[in-house]
C-alpha cells in the first residue's frame, strides 16, 4: 500500500485526530523516501560484510543521514563501524527534558551466505522509522520535546555490538527503543532466548598412530567424546534448551595422533537462570571427555553472553494495533509465545531500556540463514513489507510520545518483567543503576 493508512482515504482529513494525522504524516514521509531507502538496503545487501568489519555498510548509512537536513551525525560512535544520528524538536523551555526515542540499525552479514538474516532490511527499517517520526514531529508539537536517535549497531551475528555500546553508555538516557527483524511472519514478540558461546580446546600428545599409538594422548578422541556427551545430554535437556556445535580442528594427518582439537558450541535457554544450569551441565561434559582421554581442556568464550529479550506487553499491544491498521496479519499469541527463536544482543538492550523487537514477513517463506533467505532479503517484494513495518514502528513511537499514560505503562511493564526475570521482587540500587533507561529510572 502507499503512504496512507487503510481507510484514511489518502488524505489527512479534518476528522482525523491530531495523533492520527501525525501517524498519517509519518507513513507519508516514509513513502516519500521509498526509493532512497530501497537503494540503501540494496547497497548493504549487495556488499555483505562480517561482524565489526562493516565498513561499506557503515559508509552507506552515515552518508544517508549526513545528506538529510537537521540530523547531527557521529560517524564513528564508540566502535569503528557504529554510528549515532540525532534529530531533536525545539526545546520549549530549559526545564523540559526531551523524550528520547531510539531506533536501531543492524548491517552485518553471515559467512558465505551474505545477508541471509536480512540485516540490510533491519537497517532500512530503522532509518525509515526514524525519518517517519521526524516527518510527523515537524508537523505537530508533542507534549514534551523529543530527541530521535538512530544507532548503528554492528556485529549482531558474532560478538554483540549492542553490548559493547551498552557498556559504553550509548543507551543511558533513552526512554524507549525500537527495531524490527525479518522473518516468515508478522509477530510483535517471539521468545528470543539467552545464549552463551563456548570454545573447547583439548591438548594431548602427538605420536605415530601406527608404530606407537600408546605414546600419544588423542585430542581428537576427547573432542568426539565431548560431542557425544552433549548428544547424550539432550535426552535430559528441557525442550526449550539448545546445544549445537562443530569440531573446528581435529588433527592434521591420519598417521599422527592429534595433539590438539577444538570445538565451538552455542548454548541457549529461555532465561539467564536456565542458561547457567545448561552451561554447568555442558561444562561437565567437556571436562569428562578430558578426564577419559588424559587431555588437558581449556574452556573460553569469544564474546558476550546474549540475554533473552524481555517482552514489553504494552509496546507489543500498541504495535499490533498500528500494524493491523496497515494490513499486517499477526501470528496468534499462543503460537508466537510457544515457538522457538534464535538469540540477539537486543536482549541485552531490553534489560536496560524499554523496547520492542518485532518480527516481520518479507514476502517469502524461506528460512533465515539459508541461501533462499538471502535472495528474499534483497528482493523488490521485500520492500513493501519493510516499509510497512517502519510505518508501524513510527506510529507506535508517536503513541508513546503523545500519550504520557502509555509511556508510564511501558515503564511499569519494563520494571515488572525485569523483577520477574531476576527473581527479585525488591528493587535494589544495583538494579536501578543498571536499568539505563531514562524514562524508567527511579528519579
From Swiss-Prot:
Coiled coil: none annotated. GO terms for molecular function: dipeptidase activity. Transmembrane segments: none annotated. It comes from the Eukaryota. InterPro entries: Bact_exopeptidase_dim_dom, Peptidase_M20, Peptidase_M20/M20A_hydrolases, Peptidase_M20_dimer, Xaa-Arg_dipeptidase. Pfam families: M20_dimer (PF07687), Peptidase_M20 (PF01546). PANTHER family: PEPTIDASE M20, XAA-ARG DIPEPTIDASE. Belongs to the peptidase M20A family. This is Peptidase M20 domain-containing protein 2. It comes from Xenopus tropicalis (Western clawed frog).
Amino acid at each position: 500500500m502507499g503512504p496512507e493508512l487503510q481507510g484514511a482515504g489518502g488524505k489527512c482529513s479534518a476528522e482525523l485526530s491530531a495523533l492520527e494525522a501525525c501517524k498519517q504524516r509519518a507513513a507519508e514521509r516514509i513513502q516519500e523516501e521509498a526509493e532512497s531507502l530501497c537503494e540503501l538496503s540494496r547497497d548493504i545487501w549487495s556488499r555483505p560484510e562480517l561482524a565489526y568489519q562493516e565498513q561499506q555498510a557503515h559508509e552507506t548509512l552515515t552518508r544517508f543521514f549526513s545528506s538529510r537536513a537537521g540530523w547531527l551525525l557521529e560517524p564513528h560512535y564508540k566502535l569503528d563501524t557504529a554510528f549515532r544520528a540525532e534529530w531533536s524538536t525545539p526545546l520549549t523551555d530549559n526545564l523540559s527534558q526531551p523524550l528520547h526515542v531510539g531506533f536501531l540499525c543492524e548491517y552485518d552479514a553471515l559467512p558465505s551466505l551474505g545477508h541471509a538474516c536480512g540485516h540490510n532490511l533491519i537497517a532500512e527499517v530503522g532509518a525509515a522509522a526514524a525519518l517517519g517520526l521526524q516527518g510527523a514531529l515537524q508537523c505537530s508539537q508533542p507534549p514534551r520535546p523529543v530527541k530521535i536517535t538512530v544507532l548503528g549497531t554492528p556485529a549482531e551475528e558474532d560478538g554483540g555490538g549492542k553490548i559493547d555500546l551498552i557498556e559504553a553508555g550509548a543507551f543511558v538516557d533513552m526512554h524507549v527503543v525500537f527495531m524490527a527483524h525479518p522473518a516468515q511472519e508478522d509477530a510483535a514478540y517471539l521468545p528470543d532466548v539467552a545464549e552463551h558461546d563456548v570454545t573447547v580446546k583439548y591438548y594431548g600428545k602427538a605420536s605415530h598412530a601406527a608404530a606407537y599409538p600408546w605414546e600419544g594422548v588423542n585430542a581428537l578422541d576427547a573432542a568426539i567424546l565431548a560431542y557425544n556427551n552433549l548428544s547424550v545430554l539432550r535426552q535430559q535437556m528441557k525442550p526449550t534448551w539448545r546445544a549445537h556445535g562443530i569440531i573446528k580442528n581435529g588433527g592434521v594427518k591420519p598417521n599422527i595422533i592429534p595433539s590438539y582439537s577444538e570445538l565451538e558450541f552455542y548454548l541457549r535457554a529461555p532465561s539467564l537462570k536456565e542458561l547457567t544450569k545448561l552451561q554447568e551441565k555442558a561444562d561437565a561434559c567437556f571436562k569428562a571427555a578430558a578426564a577419559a582421554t588424559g587431555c588437558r581442556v581449556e574452556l573460553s568464550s569469544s564474546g558476550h553472553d546474549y540475554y533473552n529479550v524481555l517482552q514489553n506487553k504494552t509496546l507489543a499491544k500498541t504495535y499490533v494495533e498500528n500494524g493491523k491498521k496497515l494490513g499486517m496479519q499477526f501470528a496468534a499469541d499462543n503460537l508466537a509465545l510457544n515457538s522457538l527463536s534464535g538469540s540477539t544482543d537486543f536482549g541485552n538492550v531490553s534489560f536496560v531500556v524499554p523496547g520492542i523487537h518485532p518480527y516481520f514477513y518479507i514476502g517469502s517463506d524461506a528460512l533465515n540463514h539459508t541461501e533462499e533467505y538471502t535472495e528474499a532479503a534483497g528482493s523488490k517484494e521485500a520492500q513493501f513489507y519493510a516499509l510497512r513495518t517502519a510505518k508501524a514502528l513510527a506510529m507506535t513511537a508517536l503513541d508513546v510520545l503523545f500519550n504520557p499514560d502509555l509511556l508510564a505503562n511501558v515503564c511499569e511493564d519494563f520494571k515488572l518483567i525485569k523483577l520477574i526475570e531476576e527473581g527479585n521482587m525488591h528493587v535494589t540500587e544495583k538494579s536501578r543503576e543498571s536499568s539505563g533507561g531514562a524514562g524508567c529510572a527511579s528519579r
